[in-house]
């Protein structure tokens, strides 16, 4: 934290709480989209991430991903179990550790939507910490202070490190896991749109901490990121329902919710670097791109159950690349970057090139290692539930409980 005064520390702590609140929001969002017999499994997959990742983060994650005394590729273990981190800076470092730990927790949770309805919870329990250490931590280091950042790529709050990373990992995971029984012949509509909309509202609320909190202070850049987050989400949701209205004859609640999330994803990498009407354009472009991208799974036959690839991978990639066009050098605050001008603000292709390189590296690393982790799990403990469990539902088969009891209605 550049200036750990009481106001800045307080804002980062509040932002950390907002980001934590996003995980149950994501659980509701995914849970509502899932089927009644699997909704508790989806909730558990999300909440498991906030059980195991904070412990892993304090043990080694923060030290490996953020320690400045490592190198441009990986940190070291000097801050193992927060060794040496005290209150000498008014608690500023502890606040940042907590804040970034919330990011680490929600990132693997994003992947859960792609593998819905058929992944063993035992495999998920191993996948989450292993993936976080081998995939998330290195990419986070490279993007935020490591060699990709030193080259000049920009990522304000995690478009590349979180959304592109988790989105392409979701694709690798479903390619190993295989399709759900009956997909795509059988439709799998959301079982509860009210849950989806509640989850969307919670995500939108929490995302202000996700993006504005990444300024690491209560300052002008935080206000800028806050406003950009608000505008991009609205524009993307609008773009999605307008496309639906024209194409299908009606706007849907699911389309509005998906569009809002797509806009939130897309503005994440750019929130602190763009100004004026730029977030509206980013939202409109991302909303349209993701609206069409979610249909690619049917064309190419990969069963991304809850559209993680179409929304998070595509949305994050679009938002990150658009920095190369919309970055405004007058709105970088204290961010030191080799390239600050987008093409529309007097820049050249160098920033766009660095954005493309950073995302390309993240895509290759994340896909390859995720695929390898899933293959290893498949050959050892197995990754897919038995046919009977998939048919009866993962809630009863894996957790011994159900979300809805008919007896409770009497």
Predicted region positions:
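Glycine- and aromatic-enriched membrane alpha-helices
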Residues: 1-410
